[in-house]
Amino acid sequence: ESSGKIEVQTYGSSQLGKDKELLQKLKLGQVDFALPSSVMSSVSDEFGVFEMPYIIKDREHMKRVQAELGDTFQAAAQAKGYHIVGYFENGFRHITNNTRPINVPSDLEGVKLRTPKSKWRLKMFKLYGANPTPMAFSEVFTALKTGVMDGQENPYAQIASAKFQEVQKYLSITGHVYTPAYILASKKHFDKHPADVLKVVNSCATSTQAFVYRKAAALETELLDVIKAAGV
């Protein structure tokens, strides 16, 4: 669509840095786009709404929230020097651990639980009695394997891709938080691109969101089977 003007190179698994580093690299122009999720609540409190338990019911609900509050989130991002190009999803988060099944909040009592760096998530799990500790995603597998952490909470996609099922005994399907992922750019650097390039980028972001939602919904059953197959 861009007649060769746009070439996208993707880097996964924190190759270009952890969440906080990538936010800084965006502003410095060292990367063009990042895909942050929970860390956005540390950028502006408006994004903390997605850290509240059981706020988002399903993807259709998320679409309505985005339609109604999208301008609010964009303004919050731009006030900090960022621009939201589009929305993907991180997904509904579930708890895995090696201590016990989590059926009620009190089952979290004393569990050393890895969380993203989100003050709201930390508050939530502290109220539930857990011992939440922020930690970079790339460090979680080793922390679970060595017992530094008892458990963690993530969507199925992250659990399966990081192979947490290999070092965890229990999966509790809690769906306690739904976290979007934001296609994020530096406002200053994004605005420097020609109008025709921006039109293509924005169009692709919008059309890809629909694909991401469809794919995520389809993968939920498939990835849950992968996790269960490991004996969790």
Predicted feature descriptions by range:
Residues 1-61, 69-73, 77-232:
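N-terminal secretory/targeting leader peptides
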